[in-house]
Amino acid sequence: MKSVALRILTIIVFLAPCFASGKSRGKKTVPFIEASVNHEKAVEGERLIYEVTLFTPDASIAGIELVSEPDFGKLARRRSAADIRLSETERNGEKYYSVVIDRFFLGLEEEGKHTLKGGCYRIGYNRQVAVNDPFWGPGYVNRVEVEELSAPDVTVKASPLPEKGRPDNFSGAVGNFNVTVSVPSGEIIAGEEAYLVVTLSGDGDLSGVAPPDVRQAFAKPLQFKSMTENRNEYISKGELGSELEMECVFVAEKEGTFTIGPISFSYFNPRTRRYEQAESTPVTIEVESGSASKSSPPVYIEI
């Protein structure tokens, strides 16, 4: 059994397996689970955040275990870290503590309707139980009370990417991105390797997307040599964000003032429902003479 958070050590109460999540049994305020995605209406190629959130009136949570996995069918998925901090909230006039207990990034590679079937989770609560030890006498011990809840199903509809307006250089990325270029401080010397950092970032998934064509931004006498990539994903304001950082190595063949051209990246914006293009601002660099920079005072050797 896969553990999502802390491991449950001792069980003293075991309820019926996987109640369908509900907010009340009679008049008693009880825990319940919600499943959600950040966009129920999406487009083909979009990456969604699927979250399972526990709402409980009791903050003394000992741990959470995964009983059965959610079923996403053929959708590409990757589990991400869940939350560990409780937040206070209110539902229907009742006070609850909420926490995201499971999270996935889902890729909508195909258009159409997709049903995301919820998994089952075991929630453990810390309890103090009165005991009468034959040696120590009356007292209290800590135990764990357990309840199992299942997440409800969620339906997502993915619209196809439009053919109209699709550019020839469409990257396949879905989101909203921008491109920036920066040159590290320091002299750039003719004939020596120099560095340029291109950053592609924004809302959406860049994990499987080809990087923009950086080489074309370097015109003679600037010579592109190599590039290394670093990709990161994060969640910001409920949206999936990505960053692709490209460190480029280049050499200027002679001294002078030169321009590194704009770098462009085409993508589909699901909010405007249009193909758009991000483009960096051209960067001007000053290249110093190699012979001047290498001049140095004489070295004296005692003999």
Label each region the model flagged.
Residues I12-S21:
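Hydrophobic h-region of N-terminal signal peptides that target proteins for export
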Residues S21-I303:
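Surface-exposed interaction/ligand-binding surfaces
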Residues M1-K2, I303:
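Accessible peptide chain termini
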Residues K2-I11:
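Sec-dependent signal peptide recognition
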